[in-house]
Amino acid sequence: MSGPLRIDWADTSLWPGRLGLTFAPGKRGVSLLHPGVMHTRDMAEDFGVLAREGVNVLAPLIEDFEFELLDMGDYHAEAGRRGIVLAPCPIPDREVPRDLAAFGALLDELMDALLDGRRVVVHCRGGLGRAGLTAACLLVQGGLGATEAVALVRRTRPGTIETAEQEEFVHTFETRQGGTP
């Protein structure tokens, strides 16, 4: 393990809750971005950080096979033990949401939590692409322009929104704004 789980909180007054981004808690195995690097996160310790930070809702954006690939077998049970509500919406790595209805429903669920003053954290494998896209869309839904939302997410967690397609998705989401992407 390489230190406590880091949650990067977006600095915004759009809602009374807090929006954070992180990487997959408890992930284990070979890094995709850094050859030779092994992830050895401790699931219980990472969820302990989430609980101490007061996280109420955790949105995993990874696909089902990634839970196995990253040796995250205790993920769902650990969330349950900590009283953290899971709001999953799988998105393929380095891509954009394919199921727009499901993604729109996720954004609405997370927005409701933020407006209720809860702490919401979104994550993908590395906490950059899918997590950044989702956080930026929430900021747009909350009232920011797409360019400002992307910039805020990138200030909050450098390297977020990894592909041009992901950034374009946020801008397209802004033009379609009305609650669904």
Task: Name each region found by the language model.
Residues 1-121, 134-181:
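Cys-dependent protein tyrosine phosphatase-like superfamily
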Residues 124:
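Short cysteine clusters
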Residues 127:
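Conserved G/P- and acidic residue-centered "switch" motifs that form tight phosphate/ATP-binding loops
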